[in-house]
């Protein structure tokens, strides 16, 4: 384990962001562990330190704009934009569709980094990428605090503060469901 990995894990535990239990993820899968990065993001100094790990990985990437899908990517986009001297905006859902609102625009040819707090399946950042590309922007990387993908979920280069292997299950194969353990649904995908 790298020193930065230990620092990130220790910080996530310290703020109560790494949870144990039975969780219904926004992807629809179930897990016995959950990373609630909102618990990290409520502490600006700790978030700054954890996001510096991924900001350092972006130093040699040529990009113009940071875009974070609401909800999890908004503060991450702001903080990475602040650390790297880039403007930051966000996409959000309107009537269930990811879109740009609030006067935000992406110029044709702008190079964009998409941010997230946690990436599991990549659904949110893929929706944001579609919006960016429809506006004429070019996605050059995806970054997150926690990468918990089971493998390659994107053709875009992906950078993270930490890679965590957290097992997840389809609902019909979930051992916690079979044991009758009730789940909680901590994600934000259903925000309209």
UniProtKB/Swiss-Prot annotation:
Q: Which SUPFAM superfamilies match?
A: PRTase-like
Residues given in the record as 5-phospho-alpha-D-ribose 1-diphosphate binding sites: 116-124
Q: Which GO terms describe its molecular function?
A: magnesium ion binding; orotate phosphoribosyltransferase activity
User: Record-annotated residues binding orotate?
Assistant: 120, 148
Report the catalytic activity. orotidine 5'-phosphate + diphosphate = orotate + 5-phospho-alpha-D-ribose 1-diphosphate
Q: Which terms are listed as keywords in the entry? A: Glycosyltransferase, Magnesium, Pyrimidine biosynthesis, Transferase
Q: Which Pfam families match?
A: Pribosyltran
Q: Which cofactor does it need?
A: Mg(2+)
Question: EC number(s) per UniProt?
Answer: 2.4.2.10
Write out the GO biological process terms: 'de novo' UMP biosynthetic process; pyrimidine nucleobase biosynthetic process
Pathway field: Pyrimidine metabolism; UMP biosynthesis via de novo pathway; UMP from orotate: step 1/2
First-tier enzyme category under EC: transferase
Entry's PANTHER family? OROTATE PHOSPHORIBOSYLTRANSFERASE, URIDINE 5'-MONOPHOSPHATE SYNTHASE
Per the record, the similarity remark reads:
Belongs to the purine/pyrimidine phosphoribosyltransferase family. PyrE subfamily.
Q: How does it assemble?
A: Homodimer.
| Function of the molecule | Catalyzes the transfer of a ribosyl phosphate group from 5-phosphoribose 1-diphosphate to orotate, leading to the formation of orotidine monophosphate (OMP).
Protein name from the UniProt record: Orotate phosphoribosyltransferase
User: What's the source species for this entry?
Assistant: Clostridium perfringens (strain 13 / Type A)
Q: Which gene encodes it?
A: pyrE
